[in-house]
């Protein structure tokens, strides 16, 4: 009787540990890269960073807070040269974005702000 209880407990613990490890791996993978493509540029500023990713046809950007937690004003703007800007603005806990634009053979300009501090790139990826 006691042996069956121990075996049952060990099996349940093994299943729980396996499921929790698999779940945390998915969360880490999602946090690593929200945008598709290769990392093209990272711009650091006081309260966070702008992350810019590029594929052949598209550019994607997001503003990530250095210390996630409380909701605060965040924004990210991505504009292809000669086109309209894609903007994500609001009160977020971790990041603003991602925003994506079609930028095949075009320069882009990226700007972002978190809690009153901002950064911008000028025209890049030309």
Model regions: which residues?
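Post-signal peptide N-terminal regions of Sec-secreted extracellular proteins
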Residues: 26-126
């Amino acid at each position: 009787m006691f042996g069956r209880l121990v075996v049952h407990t060990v099996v349940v613990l093994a299943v729980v540990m396996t499921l929790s490890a698999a779940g945390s791996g998915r969360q880490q993978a999602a946090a690593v890269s929200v945008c598709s493509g290769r990392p093209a540029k990272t711009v650091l500023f006081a309260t966070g960073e702008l992350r810019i990713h590029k594929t052949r046809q598209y550019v994607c950007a997001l503003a990530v807070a250095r210390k996630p937690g409380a909701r605060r004003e965040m924004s990210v703007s991505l504009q292809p040269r000669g086109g309209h800007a894609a903007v994500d603005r609001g009160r977020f806990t971790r990041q603003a974005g991602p925003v994506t634009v079609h930028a095949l053979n075009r320069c882009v300009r990226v700007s972002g702000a978190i809690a009153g501090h901002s950064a911008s790139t000028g025209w890049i990826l030309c």
